[in-house]
């Protein structure tokens, strides 16, 4: 490694980086970018975001005394360069793998990871808390939050900035704006003015003038307006952040490491809330990623020399099946509306957005708004479908209850990534949606066992006039044939196999694993389909005719489908031995989906072992 990366190989911590001359930093950035590309192409992971913040990462760790100074990355997709510079360079080959380093900043992993993240727009709120604590302790430490132009659109980010401005907290928010390539207003003039506005002479004169002019409000207001006008000429965005109480600097070139170091060095000495706007290019330095930053956002293993990603398998994903269903229904119903909170690609809605632009709404990273926006459409007679990841629906729980369920509005929730998601780890597992939805009156919850069932359930939800949820997993579908759409009888499961002694009640896509066990031991197998309303008649019949009941689901055991079965049996006084298989009471770490199923006992071998342990007692 030393021959290929002569500078980077010597950097085992930011302390090593800070020993280098400033003139060497661009070479460090070049090596870091090359190493990042080499590493991610061999492991899979998030690529384009990290390529875009290489210079910023080097400059931040060079100027700020991390880990004493607190550096917080929002979401964490862009934090791979940060991990490489903070002692984890030689472990990058394990990222996103079982027992490897975490795909996002993770407090348990490193002192340099101040906040564990994975979801967006949390950095500034945590940063305000950390900065307030530092002020109370007179610690002298600095707090820096790096947030992207997507994440900053979320309401939580503005709530935090509004609070920070009111508190006049010493902290720096850096907006990494990579929505477009470096534009004409990011150049010599902007870089020069950024140094002026962030410099000690300017800020000392400005702050001193404010104190003197407090007694002359007319002149004070004139000077304030003049400063705002000058900043506004350079960057119209500045007014918004200035009104929130931040001193706005920028935009500056986020790939000019000399200017970044100069500006950050100035801003580190400033008091109060500071806001630095930088412009970067997502995928910087690797042309295919620059040209297709969305495609190279998260990548599988690939050969970077060929300039293209490997083609996906021919079996469609559950997300693809959902997108196709949405298009099929939109052809028949112009009042069907598809809604996504900034997850068009992940949720399989690209084709729908192109074919039916008038029926498609991307509301940005605003899950709360997405749900209540859907409620408003339902009130007006439309048929909204909110396509959302299970872990992101958590962010809109009050809206689900207050704005949809209480009013019994026909909003369809297409819940993607339900269950075990794999390499993204704890923050992205879809482990809780059944539990937190099942207790809500008026909700109908469906768990398809394959893509055909999924289509029928989505169609069933479309035909209903109440809140509905269809939850389906990440990854490839089963490859079964798709039948013509037909509404299912609500609350009715189906018997897959009649057996003896043991009955397995399956909820969701683990049906094939259960089938292997049922066929081997001649157990009864039922595909329950609905968590709510539960097929109580089928549960009662199986309880009467079997010695042991086993529930199987990809959700937390607490409050899940198994709990629903247990509650019903208690209600009717049928006390039977019951084994509830699902996700235990801990946050499931990163691994492949297959590895997680095995670890949790949710594959065929694990299911068989758990059942046999009870049968043999």
Curated annotation (Swiss-Prot):
Pathway: Metabolic intermediate biosynthesis; 1-deoxy-D-xylulose 5-phosphate biosynthesis; 1-deoxy-D-xylulose 5-phosphate from D-glyceraldehyde 3-phosphate and pyruvate: step 1/1. GO terms for biological process: 1-deoxy-D-xylulose 5-phosphate biosynthetic process; isopentenyl diphosphate biosynthetic process, methylerythritol 4-phosphate pathway; terpenoid biosynthetic process; thiamine biosynthetic process. Keywords: Isoprene biosynthesis, Magnesium, Metal-binding, Thiamine biosynthesis, Thiamine pyrophosphate, Transferase. SUPFAM superfamilies: Thiamin diphosphate-binding fold (THDP-binding) (SSF52518), TK C-terminal domain-like (SSF52922). Mg(2+) binds at residues 149, 178. It catalyses: D-glyceraldehyde 3-phosphate + pyruvate + H(+) = 1-deoxy-D-xylulose 5-phosphate + CO2. GO terms for molecular function: 1-deoxy-D-xylulose-5-phosphate synthase activity; magnesium ion binding; thiamine pyrophosphate binding. Its cofactor is Mg(2+); thiamine diphosphate. SMART domains: Transket_pyr (SM00861). GO terms for cellular component: cytosol. Binds 1 Mg(2+) ion per subunit. Its EC number is 2.2.1.7. Thiamine diphosphate binds at residues 77, 118-120, 150-151, 178, 286, 367. InterPro entries: Dxylulose-5-P_synthase, THDP-binding, Transketo_C/PFOR_II, Transketolase-like_Pyr-bd, Transketolase_BS, Transketolase_C, Transketolase_CS. Belongs to the transketolase family. DXPS subfamily. Catalyzes the acyloin condensation reaction between C atoms 2 and 3 of pyruvate and glyceraldehyde 3-phosphate to yield 1-deoxy-D-xylulose-5-phosphate (DXP). Homodimer. This is 1-deoxy-D-xylulose-5-phosphate synthase. It comes from Actinobacillus pleuropneumoniae serotype 5b (strain L20).
């Amino acid at each position: 490694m030393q021959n290929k990366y002569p500078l980077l190989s010597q950097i085992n911590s930011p302390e090593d980086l800070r020993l280098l001359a400033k003139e060497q930093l661009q070479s460090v950035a070049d090596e870091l970018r090359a190493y990042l590309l080499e590493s991610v192409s061999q492991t899979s992971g998030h690529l384009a975001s990290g390529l875009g913040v290489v210079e910023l990462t080097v400059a931040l760790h060079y100027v700020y005394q991390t880990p004493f100074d607190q550096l917080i990355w929002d979401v964490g997709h862009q934090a791979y360069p940060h991990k490489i510079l903070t002692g984890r360079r030689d472990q990058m080959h394990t990222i996103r793998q079982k027992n490897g380093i975490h795909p996002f900043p993770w407090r348990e992993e490193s002192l340099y990871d101040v906040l564990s993240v994975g979801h967006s727009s949390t950095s500034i709120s945590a940063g305000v808390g950390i900065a307030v604590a530092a002020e109370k302790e007179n610690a002298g430490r600095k707090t820096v939050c790096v947030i992207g132009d997507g994440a900053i659109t979320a309401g939580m980010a503005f709530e935090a900035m509004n609070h920070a401005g009111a508190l006049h907290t010493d902290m720096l928010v850096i907006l990494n704006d990579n929505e477009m390539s470096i534009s004409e207003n990011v150049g010599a003039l902007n870089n020069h003015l950024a140094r002026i506005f962030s410099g000690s002479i300017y800020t000392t004169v400005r702050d001193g003038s404010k104190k003197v002019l407090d007694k002359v409000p007319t002149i004070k207001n004139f000077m304030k307006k003049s400063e705002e006008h000058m900043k506004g000429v350079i960057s119209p965005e500045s007014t918004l952040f200035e009104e929130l109480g931040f001193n706005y600097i920028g935009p500056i070139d986020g790939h000019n490491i000399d200017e970044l170091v100069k500006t950050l060095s100035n801003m580190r000495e400033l008091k109060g809330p500071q806001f630095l706007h930088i412009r970067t290019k997502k995928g910087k330095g690797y042309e295919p990623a620059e040209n297709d930053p969305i495609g190279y956002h998260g990548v599988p293993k690939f050969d970077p020399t060929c300039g293209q990603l490997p083609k996906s398998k021919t079996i469609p994903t559950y997300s693809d099946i959902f997108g196709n269903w949405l298009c099929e229904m939109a052809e028949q119903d112009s009042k069907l509306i598809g809604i996504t909170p900034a997850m068009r690609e992940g949720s399989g809605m690209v084709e729908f957005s192109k074919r039916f632009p008038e029926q498609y709404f991307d509301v940005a990273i605003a899950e709360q708004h997405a749900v209540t926006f859907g409620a408003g459409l339902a009130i007006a007679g439309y048929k909204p479908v909110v396509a959302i990841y299970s872990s992101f629906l958590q962010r809109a729980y009050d809206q689900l209850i207050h704005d949809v369920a209480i009013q019994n509005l026909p909003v369809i929730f297409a819940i993607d990534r339900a269950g075990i998601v794999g390499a993204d780890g704890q923050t992205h597992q879809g482990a809780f949606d059944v539990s937190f939805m099942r207790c809500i009156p008026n909700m109908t919850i469906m768990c398809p066992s394959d893509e055909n069932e999924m289509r029928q359930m989505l169609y069933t939800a479309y035909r209903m006039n109440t809140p509905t949820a269809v939850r389906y997993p990440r990854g490839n579908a089963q490859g079964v044939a798709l039948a013509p759409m037909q509404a299912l009888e609500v609350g009715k499961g189906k018997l897959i196999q009649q057996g003896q002694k043991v009955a397995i009640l399956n909820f969701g896509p683990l049906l094939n694993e259960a089938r292997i066990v049922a066929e081997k031991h001649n157990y009864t197998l039922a595909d329950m389909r609905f968590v709510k309303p539960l097929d109580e008649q089928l549960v009662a019949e199986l309880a009467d005719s079997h010695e042991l009941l086993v529930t199987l689901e990809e959700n937390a055991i607490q409050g899940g489908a198994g709990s629903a079965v247990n509650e019903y049996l208690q209600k009717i006084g049928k006390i039977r031995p019951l084994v509830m298989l699902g996700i235990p009471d801990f946050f499931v770490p990163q691994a492949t989906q297959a590895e997680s199923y095995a670890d949790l006992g949710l594959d065929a071998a694990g299911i068989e072992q758990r059942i046999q342990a009870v049968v043999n007692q």
